[in-house]
Amino acid sequence: MRVDLFDFELPSENIALRPARPRDSARLLGVGRDGPFRDLIVRDLPDLLNPGDVLVFNDTRVIPAQLEGQRGEARVGATLHKRIDLRRWQAFVRNAKRLREGDVIQFGAGVTATAEMRLPDGSWTLFFPGEEPVEVLLERAGRMPLPPYIAGKRPTDEQDREDYQTMFAAKDGAVAAPTAALHFTPSLMEALAARGVATETLTLHVGAGTFLPVKADDTQDHQMHAEWGTIDAATADRLNAARAAGKRVIAVGTTSLRLLESATGEDRVIRPFEGDTSIFITPGYTFRAIDGLMTNFHLPKSTLFMLVSALMGLDRMQAAYAHAIAGGYRFYSYGDSSLLLP
């Protein structure tokens, strides 16, 4: 499909620079396969779900993966986006034209890294010497890696260390938040439990590649980025049992959805999974694992807008986004959300 079919105009005032407070007061657009759109708030979610429905959350934790440093006299910026091993990370490096293999970058706070290898996609392998885990070094020297559409409009601050982390965050490794889950609060979780809604968690370490633009003119020519994820056997078994009992599995966020679909065969059985996934979902895809999706509003011509269009239909999603824009919904990572139930 032509990528420009997934384009739309978004006024800059619709881009959220801070999250709603409290988190579950954000707006929620209810979208079915047909019929009118429903203007709700996230706190309404328990009334929209049935007892026995299962919400699936991503428990990855965002690390402060953005570093600013010096290579000699030159300033260098790095965004770590994929762990290679205990001391090596793959990173997008800014101002890297003169960076050479073996160069040492001083990131401050006693943190240094050696540029080991330039990779075919233009990123670099960085080696962090010493005994401390790299995650500890990042807590000392790094900043939260806010998406470019936020970071380009205001500086990152300490508040983002809290705001850009979900209540489920448990496993270090993401460089972008699974943003649909940012809307959940302990009180909302209590209300969902009282409604009889079940919850499960999986782990997908969201990479910076999630923000890379689609440069191809046709979707079939786009190379999707890979991200590491895992679903354990017990979780897979419970999800399969819920579906066998006629209950709905609803992914909270596109990261949860992509990992669930990666772990599910043509027989619609969810299996344990551990490894990289580069699944790219576009219209025409047959969903095997999920019955619905809660997700924020995505960028024009992005792989994630293609994903929601695959779930609900392109015309339906273009209409939903037009409704959201006209209604003043807030877009992107810190913005409002939608509940898509085909």
Curated annotation (Swiss-Prot):
Q: Which UniProt keywords apply?
A: Cytoplasm, Queuosine biosynthesis, S-adenosyl-L-methionine, Transferase
Database matches in InterPro entries: QueA, QueA_dom1, QueA_dom2, QueA_sf
**A Pfam family name for this chain?**
Queuosine_synth
Any one GO biological process: queuosine biosynthetic process
Question: Transport: present as a keyword of the record?
Answer: no
Its Enzyme Commission number? 2.4.99.17
Which pathway is this protein assigned to? tRNA modification; tRNA-queuosine biosynthesis
Q: Please explain the role this protein plays, according to its UniProt record.
A: Transfers and isomerizes the ribose moiety from AdoMet to the 7-aminomethyl group of 7-deazaguanine (preQ1-tRNA) to give epoxyqueuosine (oQ-tRNA).
Question: What's the name of the protein?
Answer: S-adenosylmethionine:tRNA ribosyltransferase-isomerase
Biological classification of the source: Bacteria, Pseudomonadati, Pseudomonadota, Alphaproteobacteria, Sphingomonadales
